[in-house]
């Protein structure tokens, strides 16, 4: 038996079989949550007798799903054993697909990467053929990682746009009203699959392993091709009713008659985003501005976008800096409204633009000071993401673990 088998439904459909299976699931979930525990601690936590817990522990040991981690050193008398989930047989796979490429990462229980690939150029398109290739690439990554597939307890796929994580639907990719996307992918790769919004996963990654240092109320800004936010309140990801929270880029802030990708006019993204930057750069050149950066109209908009960003870092091009400064000031003003409403402890700036450092951070900070309430502004610290492109796959792996810890009903 693998951990994935244990976390699935009981093979014994009798009442006693289901009850016993559920107890062993609860023990494993408890150990995943707290790290390690004695039989007495598990008995207290799960409100089950010591003999019953001992019997279940012995079965889990026999199945090599948990291990004896050693004795408690500071206990008087007979020292009890500590038990933990077998770390060499428990892995989480995070996958992030966006307009720039696809990233893969497998983490162990210690949240260490066993294998990671952030450089796949595969672009997921909204076609069935592309989805099947996407699934094949997941399988190839697992095979190349040399991690036994049976030890991967779950896969979390991050996609942009509106994601219903509870039901497994993406409303931007492969939306089939009667078939959740997670079912299609799971059927193809043979693993449990979860779906998450890319910005929310990045937020969780930063919270778990990034710049967050104990703060419990956080706004994460994903400033990339599009613009979104992730929100953590009291240490928990905020989803909203159906999981669509964080569509910050579609705030209707401008009377500019520019059509957004969402179908509305005047969204924040129409003035401050990667795709807006490309349009603004082209328009500036048409208006007679000069730049050290030249973009080939035969290349994709995504390639043009990354070239403009590189123009700031590599050549410190005046036009690129001017456009990004203007965008960042607009974002700062929009963020000031959020800060006034939510009163967070920490604002994390992430996404592609964050690698530009002070070229983005200083204009945002200036606008925050100018437009947010002084008392509220003094409460919030602003930091740049330290995880970069790893944030998404880190968060995806963490999402799987959190899903496994969902209380049994």
Label the predicted regions.
Residues 1-69, 75-78, 82-118, 123-148, ...:
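ATP-binding/phosphotransfer module of carbohydrate and carboxylate kinases, centering on a glycine-rich
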Residues 92-96, 152-156, 218-222, 228-230:
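Short glycine-aspartate micro-motif
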Residues 120-217, 359-369:
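Glycine-rich phosphate-binding loop and adjoining helix at the ATP-binding site
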């Amino acid at each position: 038996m693998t951990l994935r088998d244990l976390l699935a439904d009981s093979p014994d459909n009798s009442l006693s079989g289901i009850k016993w299976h559920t107890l062993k699931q609860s023990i494993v979930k408890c150990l995943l949550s707290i790290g390690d525990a004695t039989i007495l601690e598990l008995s207290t936590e799960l409100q089950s007798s010591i003999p019953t817990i001992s019997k279940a522990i012995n079965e889990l040991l026999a199945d090599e799903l948990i291990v004896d981690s050693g004795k408690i050193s500071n206990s008087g008398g007979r020292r009890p054993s500590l038990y933990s989930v077998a770390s060499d047989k428990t892995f989480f796979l995070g996958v992030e697909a966006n307009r720039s490429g696809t990233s893969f990462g497998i983490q162990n229980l210690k949240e260490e990467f066993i294998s990671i690939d952030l450089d796949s150029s595969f672009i997921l398109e909204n076609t069935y053929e592309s989805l099947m290739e996407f699934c094949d690439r997941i399988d190839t990554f697992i095979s190349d990682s040399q991690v036994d597939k049976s030890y991967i307890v779950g896969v979390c796929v991050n996609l942009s746009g509106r994601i219903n994580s509870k039901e497994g639907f993406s409303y931007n990719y492969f939306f089939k009203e009667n078939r959740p996307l997670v079912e299609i992918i799971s059927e193809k790769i043979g693993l449990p699959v979860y779906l998450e919004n890319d910005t929310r996963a990045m937020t969780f990654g930063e919270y778990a392993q990034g710049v967050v240092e104990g703060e419990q109320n956080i706004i994460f800004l994903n400033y990339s091709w599009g613009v979104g936010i992730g929100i953590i309140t009291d240490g928990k990801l905020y989803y909203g009713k159906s999981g669509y929270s964080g569509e910050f880029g579609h705030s209707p802030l401008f009377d500019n008659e520019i059509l957004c990708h969402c179908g509305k006019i005047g969204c924040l993204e129409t003035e401050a985003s990667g795709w807006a930057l490309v349009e603004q750069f082209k328009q500036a050149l048409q208006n007679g501005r000069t730049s050290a950066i030249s973009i080939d109209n035969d290349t994709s908009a995504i390639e043009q976008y990354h070239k403009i960003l590189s123009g700031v870092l590599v050549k410190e091009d005046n036009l690129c800096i001017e456009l990004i400064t203007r965008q960042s000031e607009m974002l700062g003003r929009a963020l000031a409204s959020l800060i006034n409403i939510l009163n967070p402890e920490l604002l994390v700036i992430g996404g592609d633009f964050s690698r530009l450092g002070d070229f983005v951070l200083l204009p945002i900070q200036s606008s925050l000071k100018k437009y947010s309430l002084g008392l509220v502004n003094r409460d919030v610290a602003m930091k740049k993401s330290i995880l970069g492109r790893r944030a998404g796959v880190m968060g995806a792996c963490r999402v799987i673990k959190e899903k496994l810890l969902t209380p049994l009903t």
